[in-house]
Design a protein with these regions (language model features):
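Conduit-forming functional cores of very large proteins
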Residues: 358-359
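N-terminal chloroplast transit peptides
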Residues: 1-14
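Glycine-rich Rossmann-fold phosphate-binding loop(s) that bind the pyrophosphate
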Residues: 362
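Short acidic-hydrophobic catalytic motif
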Residues: 393
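Metallocofactor- and cofactor-centric catalytic cores in central/energy metabolism, strongly enriched
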Residues: 27-353, 368, 372-374, 380-381, ...
Length: 398
């Protein structure tokens, strides 16, 4: 997402009453007095973004990273070969965002809102993030938990367009996985123009979220339906952290599923086989990590998400010293919870080491939190043994 997002109230503060009625084209082509602080601020935020698209015409309107919907000016429509392919009216991004959020609020349920937002992301990525950033509190539960869990359960039924990259057990070699991630420079027949083609549409990847779908939220093994988790998590990377969408890569490692309901589901989009385990599984993960490092460099961030308990800790220990990676369920959740507990100490006036902790559940998240709580109590002077004595984990058997 390029540029900054202005809230209406802030825009009203900067615009004079006459400027509010200018069209987008008039507004952007007006003469600016850069000595005026207000006009300079507006110029920086709303100056025209000069991008030469790699496609034109209908293909441009089908490219979510380039499509601006009805915000294309007349000159842009004529130059890019889309004049006549859009309705004749012109709408600013703000107007389009208002239309989207108004329609979302009239949907009958959260899953319908998720489907509509998913379609918008496929159609106009910049508008999708504009709507999301302007309505974070309202839309975060739609884009991610809890609605994404329901969407994953019904992913085969609501599936529209592919998002992310699927690495299967049949791609179990560094060269095959690298081929999927590749970004090749090709030439047109007359060698007068260059264009890029690839399995994945962007080359400069800085953040990867990967899951094998074995333990999706609290819903269990959802197999290939788990792709909704990396997609949703990276949408939050963009909306909350300002990461460029083109730097993000959602990945689903498909090694099958042990969920018989999915294997019997006629709409299931993944491999119809039981999960691969053992050395073959480990080799696939090793090859995936090597291919990512080979393609995107040592510093590419790889976030492990919703792996099963038996693999989550093991893979974290296996890769943490050699790759820029972390497990969100173990480390990400734990860091947030411990930060909250540390904030509570300001109210209770007690150190964390002066309290005992009971966990309802003994999954990856609970164990990760417990380990980080123990580390914090050790930092406060307790021995590891004394710190562990203050931790109680209640598993499914009580």
């Amino acid at each position: 997402m390029l540029g900054s997002v202005l809230k209406t109230s802030r825009l009203d503060m900067l615009l004079s009453s006459s400027e509010r009625f200018l069209s987008t084209t008039q507004f952007l082509t007006r003469e600016w007095n850069l000595d005026d602080p207000k006009q300079k601020a507006l110029y920086k935020l709303y100056r025209a973004e000069r991008v030469t698209p790699s496609v034109r015409g209908v293909d441009l309107l089908k490219s979510p990273d380039l499509n601006k919907g009805m915000a294309f000016s007349l000159q842009e429509r004529q130059y890019l070969g889309i004049h006549g392919l859009l309705p004749p009216a012109f709408m600013t991004e703000e107007q389009q965002a208002y239309r989207v959020i108004s329609k979302l609020r009239k949907q009958p349920n959260d899953l319908a809102r998720y489907i509509q937002l998913d379609a918008l992301q496929d159609r106009n990525e910049k508008l999708f993030y504009r709507v999301l950033c302007d309505n974070l509190k309202e839309l975060m539960p739609i884009v991610y938990t809890p609605t994404v869990g329901l969407a994953c359960q019904q992913f085969g039924f609501i599936y529209r367009n592919p998002k992310g990259v699927y690495i299967t057990i049949n791609d179990n070699s560094v060269s095959k996985i690298y081929q999927i991630l590749r970004f090749l420079l090709n030439f047109l027949e007359n060698f007068s123009k260059k264009f890029f083609s690839s399995n994945w549409k962007f080359n400069e990847i800085k953040a990867i979220v990967v899951t094998d779908g074995e333990r999706i939220l609290g819903l269990g093994d959802l197999g290939a339906y788990g792709i909704g988790i990396p997609v949703g998590k990276l949408a939050l990377y963009v909306a909350l952290a300002g990461i460029q969408p083109r730097w993000c890569l959602p990945v689903l490692i498909d090694v099958g599923t042990d969920n018989q309901e999915l294997l019997d589901d006629p709409f299931y989009i993944g491999l119809r086989r039981n999960r691969v385990t053992g050395p073959e599984y480990d080799t696939l993960l090793d090859n995936f990590m090597k291919a990512c490092r080979k393609k995107y460099g040592q510093n590419v961030l790889i976030q492990f998400e919703d792996f099963g308990n038996k693999n989550a800790y093991r893979l974290l220990e296996r890769y943490r010293d050699d790759y820029c990676m972390f497990n969100d369920d173990i480390q990400g959740t734990a860091s947030v919870v411990v930060a909250g507990l540390l904030a509570c100490t300001r109210v209770t006036k007690k150190k964390m080491s002066e309290s005992s902790y009971v966990f309802l559940g003994a999954g990856g998240a609970a164990l990760g939190i417990a380990e980080m709580v123990v580390l914090q109590m050790q930092n406060e002077g307790l021995s590891k043994e004394d710190a562990c004595s203050k931790i109680y984990l209640m598993d499914v058997d009580g």
